[in-house]
A protein has these predicted regions:
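Conserved C-terminal structural/oligomerization subdomain of aldehyde/semialdehyde dehydrogenase
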Residues: 13-16, 48, 59-61, 68-193
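Active-site region of PLP-dependent enzymes
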Residues: 16-22
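Conserved small-domain helix->loop->beta segment predominantly found in fold-type I
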Residues: 22-23, 52-63, 76
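Short beta-strand to alpha-helix junction loop
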Residues: 29-40
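Helical element adjacent to the flavin cofactor pocket in flavoenzyme catalytic cores
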Residues: 41-51
Length: 193
């Protein structure tokens, strides 16, 4: 394994999973039992199809109640696996190598349902801006994770249907109407009423 993969594994294993405002929690529960079962199924199916589980993949030790999934790291993930093709909406990282930036962008845009958020981490901001412009996601975050009620939030395709947060979210509820008025009211467009 390369140094990047080792760092991701270390970060996943060091995550503090739970739900307690008095402790420094880094990973909370997934939304409900159905989501947990779906995520567990994605991991189990990937492993049965040849992916390698390097961290997580099940409930964290000591958290038998609730909908917690330990931060999960998979390698040897192929493009035919559901964990590759679908947005997980859970603490699962699939490490998939690439050879060219064209291949990287093709793979990143290869989600069946559309795209809610993509994250880019790099020291090369010109590269980040290039990739951001080429990604088909409703939200691109560069070198960080930022969620703010004043920033628009929403996806593309079937992901994050509609938009919320910020004044732009109101556009989903508005209907445009055009009214044109002639400035010359003496002839009324030749109708002479």
């Amino acid at each position: 394994r390369d140094a990047f993969t080792e760092k991701v594994i270390d970060r996943a294993r060091a995550a503090k999973v739970g739900f307690d405002k008095t402790v420094d929690i880094t990973t909370g529960p997934v939304i409900d039992a159905r989501a947990w079962t779906r995520l567990k199924g994605l991991v189990d199916d990937a492993v049965s199809e040849g992916a390698t589980l390097l961290a997580g993949g099940d409930r964290p030790a000591g958290l038998n109640a609730g909908h917690y999934l330990a931060p999960t790291v998979l390698t040897d993930v192929t493009e035919t696996m559901a964990v590759y093709r679908e947005e997980t909406f859970g603490p699962i990282v699939s490490i998939v190598p690439f050879d060219t930036k064209t291949e990287l962008l093709r793979m990143a845009n290869d989600c069946e349902e559309g795209g809610l958020t993509a994250y880019i981490f790099t020291r090369n901001l010109a590269r980040a801006e290039h990739y951001a412009a080429s990604l088909r996601y409703g939200e691109i975050q560069i070198n960080g994770v930022k969620y703010d009620i004043n920033l628009p939030h929403g996806g593309i395709g079937q992901s994050g249907i509609g938009h919320d947060c910020s004044a732009l979210a109101l556009h989903d509820y508005l209907v445009q109407k055009r009214i044109t008025r002639a400035l010359d009211t003496t002839t009324f467009g030749g109708l002479n009423p």
